Swiss-Prot record:
Stretch list, region Disordered: 1-32, 123-201, 258-298, 315-437, 523-551, 1257-1278, 1399-1449
Polar residues bias: start-end ranges: 123-133, 315-333, 384-394, 426-437
UniProt xrefs under InterPro entries: DUF4684
Organism domain of life: Eukaryota
Composition bias type Basic and acidic residues, residue spans: 1-13, 400-419, 1258-1270
Highest classification ranks of the organism: Eukaryota, Metazoa, Chordata, Craniata, Vertebrata
Protein name stated in the entry: Uncharacterized protein C1orf167
Pfam family, one: DUF4684
Length: 1449
């Protein structure tokens, strides 16, 4: 027969009271590779677990393996079929051709229209790969953890009743488990685990506990060998089942023939007006459900629900007891309340939709649990729908049941009610007859069945009741202790943090006071030190402030006091060094630790004070420098002095301060190294743990792969062996479902690969389970002790840290685990079980008794195995939970300590970094200040140089503009003067000789060419000077810039070295030298730009003075000549020769001079010039004595005029240098500085400095150039005639008159430049008249030389000869001093000059175009050929030579 789908059963394990888990419990734990869910107190129907709903989580076995194991499963398919359900590594089912029992009905074979129905199954592995045994109800709504699921079921349909045959016999249907079989509960926890059972089931047999989630093996399912008899054959079992089926059918037929009474009247009496059911008679078979009136208490409701779920067999047991015992016995032994004993057992009634069952009595004593009733009876509800009754018991298959629908079901339930209430609805007159029929032989079997169930139920409830309070008390005590410990630790930690903060503030204040007292003492001691014997202290020692430990004049008592109060004492230093070298060792006492801490804090405070002092000094220095710069506008001299270096180095000079700074940085370095070592150690530990876990995981994977290969090989070997695999398994390794199959296969006598695989899988699963059990037990024992030791150590460490080494370690004691309960209770309860009465000797009674005993033994064995499994699971779960709780707490404590240590280390690290950062910031600020000062100095110097350069450029531009204006103005004046002279000469034009006209024309042409060449040379000279000045300035500026860059680089290097030396106290002297050099550099810089300006000003002043004098002389000469030419006070000869000799030579000389003379002319205003001309004109016109000053003007003008080029040729034809003597005379004159300032033109080596341009030596270059175009136009005949005529005229005049001046000039030309010209004896006072003039510089000497003979024949002429009136300049020598000075002109002189001028004017019209004078606007040929052509002229031709030289100039 098959299981009935609508039969229900309750779980025999009660769930724990629901309680919300703590956050610490929800935390996921990992220990030994086991993962457990924290939601172990929440319960859901097992169907959700089986279906893999959202609340279902994998079991511990699934978490351990992470893959399905190759083990046996009894849930191969929805129905019985061939095939072995073996799991491979992919999770798929491997079918094999062997028969296997299936206790789960297919979901498709159930009815779709029925409400929630629960089926019974024996499951080791769920269909959906859930490895924990559980019930699988039909899909439907789930109820809460404390709400019974039977209310909706009872309210939707009438309760099913068993047949009368089965009720009389008390036997279950064949092929179905009995009512005492204890399946798993319908509500499973969220993690897939069942609630742990008892721990004292070990006395029922040699069953070993195993892990939750691991499948049952053959050893678990089989009967122990020592208590097991030889299993009957398959034929005997089939015969027994067939006979029982026939007896059941016969009993049902007999029951159906009995008279029946309609139950309608009885049902109407059982219901109240309010629609609520009310039972007036005790009905043990009626289930006790949770009422909706709310009279249950929370704890009592929990316990009743747990007890109800523990005893799923109470329904059938109570019903069997009511049928076995009489009404009087039932009322007296079970209820003992206000039930009427005369009415007997009331008939059961069907409940309609929406109805609910009421308690047994009105006062609810049975529901609350009467103490007089046995345990598990009064407080539990029973369900008449026992698991022993299935659909097959009534001859209805599931398929037919689904097809017939509601009518067939209604008829079926009516037959059940009729058979069930047969003996209860008969009238009172037939009571004795019904009583005789009820008391039959099968009732004795029901009594045994009921007593056995009661014993087990009572024992289970008692053990549960004894265990739950103790476990709850222990758990509660542990949680309270853990909570109190954590609260105490947190409170202590907060107190310590607050105390530490306050203590730190107090220490800081105390250290500051000590330091202030120490500073005051040092200030008081310092005057004594300075006033003591010995040499006076140096200036550097006085500026260092506090110098602890360096005083040599302090008395011993005061020195000892300073050493004791100084933070750098030797004892503290030794202690600190020892602590730094051994960081894990503690100090001798707490007082020493406090002293060390104070010393470190004082050192940090000293460092802070020193930095503040340095910052203050730096700000003062910067403020002083800023004020000095703003006040003076230049750099202060003390900016780079040694005072700044001393101020920086002085605070670090004391030895104790340096020592403490070194110790502080050493301590910080040790601290950082210690933190790095700690982090490395933690990383190594974590790496080792991960490596070990990885190795274990790899080993497990390798074992699984090897297991698969071995299973395959063994299966192939067993396939060849055939039936030997079945015989080797033995009877002790076979389960309930496998016994008949194995025997059937033995009888068939054939083997297959599926048989071998099945047997091998069973054996391998058993070995694997044993190995894992041993590993689990060993790991539990080992890690339990390890965790206890770790917990004790961590708690002891916490106490030592929080309360000190003298504190007690009471909190480290952990509550001991409860000892496992002994099995004496179970044995006593089993001993009290009443013996089964003797059975009748009839065949039917024997067979029924034998089958019942067999079924009872099997169920008992399975129950014992399941109880032992629950016991081991409960113990392991409790130990695991306890271990994980304390392990998590210890880990949390360790993590908190590590984080706190890390936070303190990081705080100290930040403090040290802040100190170093502040020091670096100050150093950077100082460097920035120095750099700013240096950059400002460079910027000011650059600005000054740029300003000077711009001013110089402006001056040069103004100078060029002034030169241009002067040149243009001078040219205009010259043109006006010569145009006026030309006009005067045109009015007085007369017939003159041709040579004189040509001579006059040559003079003017030469003057124009000289003016042109002088302008070109002046422009070239000015450009060259400007280029020289620019190049010189550029070179000087580049040199200065390079020097500044080199000095800046050296300065930066010196600053960096000085900064390092200041910190290390090693470079004080080098810093002082560097700052002295920096101080001297700014002092020398301002004087450098002034030097070129001063030199330029000196040159300009000298040029102005010299130019002014020269311009004044030149202006005087021109003004006098204009006056004489206009007034006619001098002779015509004198007026005609004066521009030729004096004015023209002076103009040429002034034109040749440089830009100095032209620049000076710009300073002469037109008003001053006009006033000067008017003054000279008035003096000459009135004949005042002051007019004689014009002689000095002539003298100055003629003294400055160098000899003409014709005078450079001697009478003998030899050329002698004459520029040296003339230069000597210029140096002796007052205008010599003007000529000395004239620069030397580059490339002219023969040019003597200080001489005009025409005094240079022509050299051989004079003969290399070709003849000018003007000379080529003249014919050779004209040249010879001109020379001959000129020579004759001059010789005749010289012989006739004997001009003393001409002879003197000739003698001067003959003697040379180095010889002095002797004073020629001149008759008639001629020598006396010329005595006022230097040799060769008599006025008109240049023009008089034109008439000299080049052959020197007149050298020895008589100077006493008279002066002819027709000679041009002879009357000048013969005249008196007044006439020589220009104040009076003789008539003879005027007549002679007039005659000569007339001849010249009369001769000019008769000449052709070739001999006509060249107009002024068209000067002669230009270029360097002019000066070279003069050199090629013949040297011995007198007037012709002079004419040629003047023409070329």
């Amino acid at each position: 027969m098959e299981l009935r789908s609508d039969a229900s059963h309750k779980e025999n394990v009660s769930p724990k009271p629901a309680a919300l888990p703590k956050p610490e419990q929800r935390r996921f734990r990992r220990s030994l590779g086991i993962g457990l869910s924290g939601r172990h107190d929440q319960w859901v129907p097992g169907c959700q677990v089986e279906r893999g709903g959202p609340a279902a989580t994998p079991s511990p076995g699934a978490v351990l393996d992470q893959e399905p194991c190759r083990v046996q499963t009894n849930l191969a398919s929805p129905g019985p079929r061939l095939g072995l359900a073996l799991k491979d590594t992919t999770g798929q089912l491997v079918n094999s051709s062997f028969w296997q029992q299936s206790n789960l009905q297919s979901l498709a074979r159930r009815r779709q229209g029925k409400a929630r129905e629960f089926a019974i199954q024996q499951s080791n592995l769920s269909i959906n790969e859930t490895s924990s045994p559980h019930l699988c109800p039909e899909p439907g709504g789930s109820s809460g953890p404390h709400k019974l699921p039977w209310g909706p079921l009872l309210s939707q349909e009438p309760l099913a009743r068993p047949s009368s045959c089965l009720r009389q016999s008390g036997l279950p249907a064949p092929g179905t488990p009995s009512g005492d079989f204890r399946p798993t509960e319908a509500f499973a926890p969220l993690d897939g685990h069942t609630q742990p059972g008892l721990r004292s089931w070990g006395g029922l047999g040699s069953w070993r506990s195993r892990l939750v989630g691991e499948p049952l093996t053959l050893e678990d399912l089989a009967v122990p060998s020592q208590n097991q008899t030889q299993a009957p054959s398959r034929a005997a079992v089939h015969q027994l089942l067939a006979s029982v089926h026939c007896l059941a059918q016969e009993a049902a037929r007999l029951r159906c023939q009995a008279p029946q009474e309609p139950p309608g009247a009885v049902q109407q009496d059982l219901w109240t007006g309010g629609g609520q059911p009310f039972s007036a008679h005790p009905q043990p078979s009626q289930p006790v459900l949770a009422s909706s009136d709310g009279r249950r208490r929370r704890l009592r409701g929990h316990r009743e629900t747990a007890a109800f779920l523990e005893t799923p067999a109470s329904l059938s047991d109570s019903w069997a007891q009511s049928k076995l015992m009489s009404p009087e016995t039932t009322l007296g032994t079970r209820t003992k309340d206000s039930l009427n004993p005369e009415q007997g057992l009331p008939p059961a009634h069907p409940l309609g939709s929406g109805d609910s069952c009421s308690p047994w009595s009105q006062d609810g004593r049975a529901q609350r649990g009467d103490p007089s009733l046995p345990r598990g009876v009064g407080s539990r509800g029973t369900d008449p729908c026992s698991s022993a009754f299935s659909n097959t018991a009534w001859g209805v298959s599931p398929k037919q049941k689904g097809e017939e629908g509601a009518p067939r079901e209604r008829v079926h339930r009516e037959e059940e009610r009729t058979a069930f209430h047969l003996s209860d609805t008969v009238p009172a007159s037939s009571a004795s007859k019904n009583k005789a029929q009820n008391i039959t032989a099968p009732e004795s079997e029901a009594i045994c069945w009921q007593l056995l169930s009661r014993c087990f139920r009572s024992w289970r409830h008692l053990v549960k009741r004894q265990r739950e309070p103790a476990a709850a008390a222990v758990a509660l005590g542990r949680w309270q202790l853990l909570r109190k410990c954590l609260q105490a630790l947190w409170l202590r930690e907060a107190q310590l943090e607050a105390a530490w903060g306050q203590y730190t503030k107090v220490l800081l204040v105390r250290s500051f006071r000590e330091w202030r007292n120490l500073a005051l003492q040092q200030k008081q001691v310092q005057p004594h030190m300075q006033a003591g014997p010995g040499s006076p202290p140096s200036r550097r020692a006085q500026g260092k402030g506090l110098s602890l430990g360096r005083s040599t004049v302090v008395d011993p008592a005061q020195r000892s006091r300073l050493e004791h109060t100084s933070p750098g004492s030797l004892r503290e230093e030794e202690i600190a060094q020892r602590l730094l070298s051994h960081p894990r060792q503690r100090t001798d006492s707490r007082h020493e630790r406090v002293q060390i801490l104070q010393a470190l804090q004082l050192a940090v405070f000293f460092l802070w004070c020193q930095q503040k002092k340095r910052a203050r000094q730096e700000r003062e220095t910067l403020r002083k420098a800023t004020r000095a710069t703003q006040r003076t506008g230049s750099f202060p001299q003390a900016w780079h002095s040694t005072a700044a270096g001393v101020a920086w180095v002085a605070p670090l000079s004391p030895q104790h301060q340096r020592a403490w700074l070194c110790r502080c940085f050493g301590a910080w370095q040790q601290f950082v190294q210690r933190g790095s070592r700690y982090r490395d150690h933690l990383a190594d530990r974590r790496t080792g743990t991960l490596r070990k876990c990885l190795e274990q995981w790899v080993r497990m994977k390798q074992l699984r792969e090897s297991d698969g290969a071995k299973v395959t090989q063994l299966s192939l070997c067993r396939q060849k062996a055939g039936r030997e695999a079945v015989y080797t398994a033995g009877p002790g390794a076979c389960g309930l479902g496998a016994v008949g199959q194995a025997q059937g296969q033995q009888e068939q006598g054939r083997g297959s690969l599926q048989d071998a695989c099945w047997t091998l899988a069973l054996c391998w699963a058993l070995l694997l389970w044993k190995m894992r059990l041993f590993q689990r037990q060993w790991a539990n024992s080992f890690f339990q002790g390890l965790q206890q030791r770790m917990l004790q150590r961590s708690l002891r460490w916490w106490h030592l840290r929080a309360l000190g080494p003298d504190a007690t370690s009471s909190c480290t004691k952990t509550p001991s685990a409860l000892e496992p309960l002994s099995s004496s209770t179970l044995q006593d309860s089993l001993e009290k079980v009443p013996r089964a009465p003797t059975l009748p000797d009839t065949l039917q009674g024997s067979l029924l008794w034998a089958a019942g005993q067999r079924q009872q033994g099997q169920c008992l064995l399975l129950w014992q195995a399941r109880a032992q499994q629950f016991q081991g699971t409960a113990r392991w779960y409790q130990h695991t939970r306890q271990r994980r709780i304390f392990l998590s707490w210890s880990r949390w404590a360790t993590a908190q300590w590590a984080w706190r240590e890390l936070a303190s280390h990081r705080a100290w690290d930040r403090t040290c970094r802040a100190v170093l950062g502040l020091w670096r910031q100050r150093l950077l600020q100082s460097r920035l200040v120095e750099w700013w000062a240096q950059e400002r100095g460079w910027r000011l110097a650059r600005d000054a140089l740029c300003h000077w350069h711009s001013c110089w450029q402006g001056q040069q531009f103004l100078h060029e503009k002034c030169q241009t204006w002067v040149q243009v103005h001078l040219q205009g004046l010259q043109k006006v003067v010569f145009r006026s002279w030309q006009q005067a000469a045109a009015h007085q034009r007369c017939t003159v000789t041709r040579p004189e006209q040509l001579l006059l024309q040559s003079y003017f042409q030469a003057w124009c060419e000289v003016v042109r060449d002088t302008g070109v040379l002046r422009a070239q000279h000015q450009a060259f000077q400007d280029g020289l000045r620019r190049r010189a300035l550029g070179a000087v500026f580049a040199t200065w810039r390079e020097a500044q860059e080199v000095a800046a680089g050296a300065q930066e290097q010196r600053v960096a070295q000085a900064s390092l030396a200041r910190w290390r106290s090693c470079g004080q002297q080098g810093q002082e030298d560097g700052q002295q050099k920096k101080a001297r550099a700014p002092q020398a810089f301002p004087a450098w730009p002034v030097a070129p300006g001063m030199h330029h000003e000196a040159q300009q002043q000298a040029g102005e003075s010299a130019g002014a004098q020269a311009a004044q002389c030149w202006t005087w000469c021109w003004a006098l000549w204009v006056h004489e030419s206009c007034r006619g006070q001098v002779s015509r000869a004198h007026a005609s020769w004066k521009p030729r000799a004096w004015v023209l030579e002076a103009s040429v000389q002034s034109a040749v001079r440089g830009g100095v003379q032209r620049a000076i002319l710009t300073q002469l205003r037109p008003a001053e010039l006009r006033r000067f001309l008017r003054t000279v004109q008035l003096r000459v016109r009135l004949g005042l004595p002051g007019a004689g000053k014009t002689r000095s003007c002539w003298t100055q003008a003629t003294e400055l005029v160098p000899p003409a080029p014709s005078l450079q040729c001697s009478l003998g034809g030899r050329r002698k240098p004459r520029g040296t003597a003339w230069a000597q005379r210029c140096r002796e004159h007052s205008l010599c500085p003007a000529f000395q300032l004239w620069p030397q033109w580059p490339g002219q080596s023969s040019w003597v400095p200080g001489l005009p341009l025409w005094t240079r030596d022509q050299g051989p270059r004079a003969h290399s150039s070709p003849e000018p175009r003007a000379c080529k136009a003249q014919s050779k005949a004209h040249k010879r005639r001109l020379r001959a005529r000129s020579c004759r005229i001059l010789e005749k005049q010289a012989q006739a008159h004997g001009s003393a001046l001409l002879l003197a000039l000739k003698g001067h030309d003959a003697l040379g430049h180095q010889e002095e010209v002797p004073a020629a004896p001149v008759p008639r006072g001629t020598a006396s008249r010329a005595a006022g003039f230097p040799a060769g510089q008599v006025p008109g000497s240049g023009m008089a030389a034109l008439g000299g003979c080049p052959r020197g024949r007149a050298a020895g002429a008589d100077p006493a000869q008279g002066v002819a009136p027709e000679m041009g300049l002879a009357d000048v020598v013969a005249a008196d001093p007044a006439t020589a000075s220009g104040s009076a002109v003789t008539a003879a002189g005027r007549w002679a000059f007039k005659k000569w001028h007339q001849r010249l004017a009369a001769r000019s019209p008769r000449r052709g175009a070739a001999s006509s004078p060249r107009p002024w606007s068209k000067p002669g040929p230009k270029g360097p050929e002019s000066g070279q052509e003069a050199a090629r002229a013949p040297r011995g031709w007198g007037l012709g030579a002079e004419h040629g030289a003047q023409l070329q100039l």
